[in-house]
Amino acid sequence: KIGADANTKTAPRSAVVTFASTDGSKSATVRVDQQARGEAFPSKWVFQASTLPLYGSSWTDDNVIPATSGAAGFISVVRGDANASAAFKRSVVTNRPAVSTMVEGDYWLYTFPVENLAAGSVVDFNATMAGEANSPKYFIVEYLDGGVWKSVEADLLTAPENPAVRYTYKCSGTATGSSYQHATVMQTMRFENAVTDGEVKIRCRAVGPYTCAGGTQNITATNAASSIPPYGFTGSYVQNFGTATPRDTKKVLCLGNSFSYYSNPAWMLKEIAWREGHALNIKAHFKGSQTLTQHLSLGFSTDVIEQGGYDFAFLQDQSQNPANYGRDATASILTGLTTLADKVRAASPSCKVILEETWTFSSASYG
């Protein structure tokens, strides 16, 4: 197999390779053409049956997941130095790309070929991540800037098992079925250095030896796949926001269900706000069909609430709940809202809580 580095130019390129027998009596010449790069941003990954031909075999055979729409970005997995000799086990299960035998130091790598990324550019990284019981629990989002891997220190959390383990997001250990909880990853980063005729690189690196189930990682373990969930979730979306300096920064909490993740309104909100001069640091948890009351019992929802410091919170109730909260006969709906709002304000006393009424109707009109 003949491989080539990503073409960072806007024009196609070609090369000629000659194969010759050791005695020189026979030879063959092969021309290799490589298409011009597409635009690096935005790059978007949605994993479903209709896009499977774009990534299925390239992932399992070649360790490449090209963007399914948008631009020229691609995802791969890379071993850390301690595990360099061990092979990954890559698969596609119900359209989701998965990798087993990932352990501490290994990482998901996002690569974006660029002709020029200006110094001071802000790149917005969004992803949905999942892990099985014996997969790595903690990951840190890092970006390669001037040859150095950096993280956004202000957004790092501390693992309760060991304060030396700092992370950006964690996986739940339940990737499928009714009990799943996925990690919603939203990280904005500013590149101090320009990238010219090269690649913008962002990675999600496993940190700490802990599994989602609370054990110690083992590279030969089963039930240990890390994966990127299929549609309705969007796997990833990465955009270049440009070099502007926003007028202000607000921290925003988003909790909701499928109405909050099918079309990625939180990711779009972040981009729209930036264009209007506002930076949003959004933390979120989304799970399908959940009511506000059910969010109170979801570990990932309570974790993100307890991070605190929010200026705004958007709470999106389950669409089949009547939405006349203040006067509806279905008292449990009002109770769920007020209890969740009180929990938000306990960690963020000055937070403005905003209720999203998915569909507005009374209980008399239910169904």
Q: What does each model-identified segment do?
A:
Residues 1-3:
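Surface-exposed binding patches on compact interaction domains or structured appendages
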Residues 69-119:
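Surface-exposed, low-complexity/disordered Ser/Thr/Gly/Pro/Asn-rich loops and linkers
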Residues 149, 160-244:
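Terminal, low-complexity interaction segments
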Residues 105, 114-126, 136, 197:
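Extended extracellular/luminal ectodomain segments enriched in beta-structured repeat modules
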Residues 303-367:
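Alpha-helical cap/lid subdomain in secreted, periplasmic
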Residues 245-284, 303-305:
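Serine-esterase "nucleophile elbow" of acetyl-processing enzymes
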Residues 11-23:
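A short beta-strand micro-motif common to beta-rich folds, especially ectodomain repeats
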Residues 38-71:
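Extracellular carbohydrate-recognition regions
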